[in-house]
Design a protein with these regions (language model features):
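A short, compositionally biased
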Residues: 2, 76, 129-131
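Beta-strand elements of well-folded, non-transmembrane domains
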Residues: 23-25, 84-88, 123-127
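Short acidic, gly/pro-rich beta-turn/loop elements at beta-sheet edges
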Residues: 16, 29, 90-92, 131
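Pre-Walker A-like glycine/lysine-rich segment at the N-terminus of P-loop NTPase domains
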Residues: 1-51, 55-70
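Beta-strand secondary-structure signal
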Residues: 5-7, 18, 79-83, 118-122
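Conserved P-loop NTP-binding catalytic core
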Residues: 40-113
Length: 149
């Protein structure tokens, strides 16, 4: 299983970007072109998975601001979607069933029916708490969040 796609919306200098990854992907660009932002987006998605539930905390400087939205408290939510997909049938049927099978955390794609897992991270400003609140959700095949996964 490898990371095959990352979608970034309203995060730092990136308004809307979808990157597809191969088995080897290199980020090349001029200074201030977004390479570090892409790496920070990956880190934000993966942080909760590897830290026993503690997540990277977003702050007001992480929101994409432009001429239409100069106030982080009024900015569009940050949205990150990370896609993992098997390169070929790597998982035994027992593991697929433990993860809910098709319709659970896993969805099967393509003629080969390789397993795919999608994780969505949303960060938005809360006027109630005065802080940035972050949600982590696995998505089903229809892009709907899965409850309690």
């Amino acid at each position: 299983m490898q990371i095959t796609e990352l979608t970034i919306r309203n995060f730092r200098g990136i308004k809307d970007l979808t990157l597809e990854f191969d088995s080897t992907t290199v980020l090349i660009g001029e200074n201030n072109s977004g390479k570090t932002t892409v790496l920070h987006a990956l880190r934000a998605c993966l942080s909760k998975l590897r830290s026993n539930g503690r997540a990277v905390v977003f702050d007001e400087y992480d929101f994409h601001l432009d001429e239409n939205s100069k106030d982080p408290t009024q900015a569009e939510p940050i949205e990150l979607i990370l896609t993992f997909q098997e390169t070929d049938k790597e998982w035994p049927a027992e593991i697929e069933q433990q993860l809910g099978g098709d319709g659970g955390i896993i969805s099967f794609v393509g003629a080969e029916e390789t397993a795919r897992i999608r994780l969505k991270v949303i960060a938005k400003y809360s006027a109630v708490t005065g802080d940035v609140e972050t949600e982590f959700n696995f998505l089903d095949a229809n892009e709907n969040p899965l409850a309690n996964k």
